[in-house]
Amino acid sequence: MTKKLIVISCVLTILIGLCGCAGAVKYPSYYTLHVPPPPDPSAQGNVHAILAVREFRSPAYLRQGAIVYKTSPEQIGFYNYHRWATDPRGFVTNAVADRLRAGGTFTQVKPYDGRPDVDYVLSGQLEKLEEIDYEGGVKVEVAISAQMVQLSTGTVVWTNSVSEAAPVDKRDVPTVVSVMNHTMEQAIEKLLAPGPRVSIQQSAATMRGSQ
């Protein structure tokens, strides 16, 4: 009888332990990138050109979903329980396209689908989006590059790159993400200042070619 009680007691202890472990399951927190929306589109003037925007590329480690930090230039770490809700590449692509659309330089700005019914194609790369934990203190770094090609000639008519960094006052992931958002906004603004431009001569040639 005593042995049975001991066995039952052990089983109950194990079950209680398992329940405790189940209650301690940790779920990921998800974060979004956000920048203020661009102003309403301005008047288009005499330029009549269509721009297609390819999805921005990025290094493989930025496509894993987890927020990235670096403890040295060579070492990359991941916050496995702090992840992006959406792919940062798609966010940057849409944010850049929205601002180009609002700039009024092009009659239409649309996602690139491989069709030749556009005048220009813009492509780019999100090169850095990470927390930096070396060189004293904590900061975030965002780096973006882009170029625009005239489809009819294959000529690169515009290119730019930018790298922005900002300190993080409080080291926790929500604060890091907030600083990343602000730094991303600055990086996109500088990338597109000055942004792609289309001359009236190029626009006129495009119109003649489409007739």
Residue locations for each model-derived region?
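Bacterial N-terminal signal peptides that target proteins for export
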Residues: M1-C10
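C-terminal motif of bacterial Sec signal peptides marking the signal peptidase cleavage site
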Residues: I16-G20
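A structural "domain/chain start" motif
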Residues: C21-R89, R197-Q211
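Surface-exposed short loop/turn segments
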Residues: A22-P41, D98, G103-T155
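Generic short beta-strand segments
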Residues: F56, Q125-L129, S163-E164
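Short secondary-structure boundary motifs at beta->alpha junctions and helix caps
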Residues: E74-R83, S152-A193
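Extracytoplasmic/secreted envelope proteins and their assembly/folding machinery
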Residues: R89, T93-A97, G103, N181-I188, ...
